[in-house]
Each structure stands twice: as C-alpha cells, then as structure tokens.
From Swiss-Prot:
Belongs to the ferredoxin--NADP reductase type 2 family. This is Ferredoxin--NADP reductase 2. It is an enzyme of class 1 (oxidoreductase). InterPro entries: FAD/NAD-bd_sf, FAD/NAD-binding_dom, Fd--NADP_Rdtase_type_2, Ferredoxin-NADP_redctase_2. Homodimer. SUPFAM superfamilies: FAD/NAD(P)-binding domain (SSF51905). It holds the Pfam family Pyr_redox_2. It catalyses: 2 reduced [2Fe-2S]-[ferredoxin] + NADP(+) + H(+) = 2 oxidized [2Fe-2S]-[ferredoxin] + NADPH. Disulfide bonds: none annotated. FAD binds at E37, Q45, Y50, V90, F124, D286, T327. Binds 1 FAD per subunit. Keywords: FAD, Flavoprotein, NADP, Oxidoreductase. Its EC number is 1.18.1.2.
Length: 331
C-alpha cells in the first residue's frame, strides 16, 4: 500500500497546540498518525496570530512565548514521526462501507480508521480597518498579524483596539518601539484587568474614546492617521510608522458544518469520551463543546488524551481506554 492509499490509525484535523499534543499522545499509543493542517505551518493561531506573545495559563510554565510552546510541542511529538500534510483545507469527511474514513482536501485524499478534530475556532480572518485607502497599505505598514516584534524597533507605532490582543501588543511594543499609542473607541478597555493596570502605568499614549477616520500616505506607505473623538468634536492627526489593527477575528466552521456532525452554534457537540455524533470521529480543544466547557489551551491538552484513548478503543475494542502511565512507557 503506497502513501496515497495508506489507512492511518488516527488522522488529526488541525495542527494547533492541541492537535500537536494529540499527535504525541497517539504516538505513545503506537498509533500511526497523520496531521492535516490548512495553514502553511504548524501551530495554529499561536504561530499565525501572536507567536511573540506570552501565555501565562499553561501548567508548568510561569510564562511561555507562544511560538516557544509550539516548538516544544513539535519537538515532543517528533520521536513518533507523524505524517504532516500542510496547506490542505479539509473539504469533506465520508465514512466508507468498510468503516474507514475518506478525508478529501483541496489537494489530496486521505484515509483513516478514526479522526480527531482539533481545528480550534475553525477558519478565521481578521476584522479589517474599513476606511478608504487602508487596503493599499496592508502588508506594508498596516498590520493585522505580528510575526516578528523586532521589525518595530525604533518606530512610531499606533495600535487600534480595546481587547486583550491590542493591550498586550501595545505593552510588548513599548519595549522596542520609539513610541506607542493605543486607540480605542470606548473609555474602558475590555482586556484583562492586570494588563490594563500595566497599560495605565506605562509610557504608552492612550487615545480614548477615539476612532480612526482617515489614513494618509504616499502610496508606498502609511504616514499619518486621523482620529476623531467619539460623540465629540476633537480630532487630531498622528504621524506614525506602523498601524496595528486588533479588531478581533471572524471565525467560521466552514466545510465542517456539512460533515453531518451535531453542532451547537459554531462548536461540535461531544460526549464524555470526546466522541461526536458520528462514531469514530472525536474532538478536542476549542472546536468542541459540552456542558461546562471552558475554552482554554490547558483544557484542550486534557481533552486530547481522552479523545485519543477512546479513538484507539474504537479502532480495536480489545484496547484499553486507560493506558499505562508515561513514566512506564519511557523507562
């Protein structure tokens, strides 16, 4: 059987942190594993949206940079050598007559005995700055993602938004940029209280309640933004080198909605085994929901072994759901 027709034990749809840990855990169970990821790299939103940000609620890490966590998860699963298919968005999943699954992507067809979906919030894209002329500066010095903090060294940066991402980025940019301003349409920020306290103590210029009403540039790059006071008459123009927009993201399940799974809003319903309404398909992480669900990376790390162990039992009912402890496996 060649690679094109190989039937894997477990195929993981989604290569974010929970998917990577699921791949490691499935490897510990001696499963053959494939990861299918729609993005060009592993790591999901951690790598794509905020690789430089620090995460504070991962067990065992007082603080860990998002990309560092992803790198560690990749290193952790490497001994089991899972097959990785990048830039492949899954279009459909169909159960075959023999009980295996056919997974069709935009590039290829894959086969698996069981599936674990770890697709996070599904497909996502940023809410864009809805102003004339803004689009021509996207990818130049209007940014929706930050992959390298050092590129802003010594530059005048404005951040627009009032949530955690906006405040966190402003605080991180303060360390490298020559000046940072944060613009929010309300007086109060929605970010975590601790972050807002740090913002108020920082050297960052806070512009509230203001909204950007005009972007000005020379065609090659943005040079100024005009701000207007909300429900007021004050307006001002800022000279900047970079404009970072943090209006949040619009997510969608996309084709997952058509796979025949039982859904609740934009989440897949699972039982205590992390099993979906289709036997053999399991979920872990933010993509799934159940009574009392809390959407955290740490929660997904706990759900992944449950999904994998029950998937192994589905493949072979003689297999124990409760495995040996890892300390025994690696001695």
């Amino acid at each position: 059987m060649d690679e094109k027709t190989k039937i894997y034990d477990i195929t993981i749809i989604g290569g974010g942190p929970v998917g990577l840990f699921a791949a490691f855990y499935a490897g510990m169970r001696n499963a053959s594993v494939k990861i299918i990821e729609s993005l060009p790299q592993l790591g999901g939103q951690l790598s794509t949206l905020y690789p430089e940000k620090y995460i504070y609620d991962i067990p065992g890490y007082p603080a860990v940079r998002a990309q560092e966590l992803v790198n560690n998860l990749i290193q952790q699963m490497k001994p089991f050598d899972p097959t990785i298919a990048l830039e492949e968005a899954v279009i459909s999943v169909e159960k075959q007559v023999d009980g295996t699954f056919e997974i069709i992507t935009k590039k290829d067809t894959h086969y698996s005995k069981a599936i674990v979906i770890t697709a996070g919030n599904g497909a996502f894209e940023p809410r864009r700055l809805d102003l004339p002329e803004a689009e021509q500066y996207e990818g130049k010095n209007i940014h929706y993602f930050i992959n390298d903090l050092s590129r802003f060294s010594g530059r005048r940066v404005a951040v627009c938004g009032g949530g955690d991402s906006a405040v966190d980025w402003a605080l991180m940019l303060e360390k490298v940029a020559s000046s940072v301003s944060i613009v929010h349409r309300r007086n109060a920020f929605r970010a975590h209280e601790h972050s807002v306290n740090n913002l108020e103590k920082s050297s960052i210029t806070i512009k509230t309640p203001f909204i950007p009403t005009e972007v000005l540039g020379n065609g090659d790059k943005l040079t100024h933004i005009t701000l207007q006071e909300v429900k007021g008459d004050t307006s001002e123009t800022l000279e900047i080198d970079d404009f970072i927009i943090n209006y949040g993201f619009v997510s969608s399940l996309g084709p997952i909605k058509n796979w025949g799974l039982e859904l609740e809003r934009n989440s897949i319903i699972v039982n205590s085994k992390m099993e979906t309404s289709i036997p053999g398909i399991y979920c872990a992480g933010d993509i799934c929901t159940y009574d009392g669900k809390v959407k955290l990376i740490a929660t997904g790390f706990g759900e992944a072994p449950t999904a994998v162990n029950n998937a192994m039992n589905f493949i072979d009912p003689k297999t124990r759901v409760q495995p040996m402890h890892s300390t025994s496996l690696f001695e």
